[in-house]
């Protein structure tokens, strides 16, 4: 089958693309699966792994010499297309996550399960996440936990993810998915009300059995077209192959709301996405709560506290007494600080439409555990939570820059923050390198609480990062810890040509799990559409 786009065409003037590895002979319908080009608001290319069939992938079969060669060729094919990330058309590709990330410098996130560490961090230890798979008779709870531990979760956290199979519904059993030998109309083509109701009934039964369920993770790549129905019916976030692919693309795409739009020919798809998302009314689209530290400053476009940084509504509440200095030190909360923080979180929870809570300072990672204990909503109060995604996406010897307002301030608690993000092994923590921006011309305004001249500061931020990347040739991505650094993300993406994650990519990612997908789905928030 090969890539759907010819290698002969230059990628210079094409929008960013996500590469998708396909099982050999897979013919599930595009409208139903992750491979559908209409499922995305960016370009996708596909490469078939010859000889590696669905049954092999599902079982996590050890690759033969020929299969390993075919996998390398497929990855090479996708890299030749200039893809910004590589994923798989089957959640069971997680078995080959380690192998593939050794084959490429492109971030490889082969399964929706790679979102699990972020989810585990967002919710309390007592809360659970339902994992929907095609068939739990051959991918059971033990297999799921084994994969999650291999990804990087502790056994305790892995047990919080509860498997639920759909093999009792026509079209989902492993044998039915694998049986594509004829041209008959496959059962999964059916998106009838009957099928939707069967899936929703299964979820409802799982919820009754697990009352602590707070989110749904779709391991199956055949299910994203039902995500909106799940969001509408269950009222909980639903993470799937599409939320993951969107997240990966955003890390390498110009931000249309405040970005540089440096090369319109390359980043035009970002503007197309902006136009689609701007059709959603902020009144009906879910909102995000922002927990603010006790620190006042004029935010620039792209800052977490700047309302225009989002296409949706945000609500802000200050934790009085929790100062910037206190957040930096990361000491245990005083009684007064704890009361103020909990009060702010309660007010955010009570605000209309709020579906999750973030923070306006990366150092709040020190209080992520406190925040999630105080709230029934998902809490993701620091960009540092994304570190595990980086560690898992690249080869074990590849490295990352973590840009911060002041390197000396971040260093003392850096290891603890990484551990909270499920980056626990010393060899993995050593892959993350702090890069302080305190000496960049004009950036001292951040420490002074003054307005930052973004145009003045940008060249210095870029020069700093380029010099650091030159010293460390194995750097493959950048994380912006500070919530005042996203205004420079696009300039860094353009200069370094590597993914840049920040507080905005994190917030957009979590928000997408509770929002109507404008590319497909049931449009359950249609009252929010603005027709022009």
UniProtKB/Swiss-Prot annotation:
Coiled coil: none annotated. GO terms for molecular function: dimethylpropiothetin dethiomethylase activity; racemase and epimerase activity, acting on amino acids and derivatives. It is an enzyme of class 4 (lyase). It catalyses: S,S-dimethyl-beta-propiothetin = acrylate + dimethyl sulfide + H(+). Its EC number is 4.4.1.3. It comes from the Eukaryota. Keywords: Lyase. Homotetramer. Belongs to the aspartate/glutamate racemases family. ALMA1 subfamily. Mediates cleavage of dimethylsulfoniopropionate (DMSP) into dimethyl sulfide (DMS) and acrylate. DMS is the principal form by which sulfur is transported from oceans to the atmosphere and is a key component of the ocean sulfur cycle. This is Dimethylsulfoniopropionate lyase 4. It comes from Emiliania huxleyi (strain CCMP1516). The gene is ALMA4.
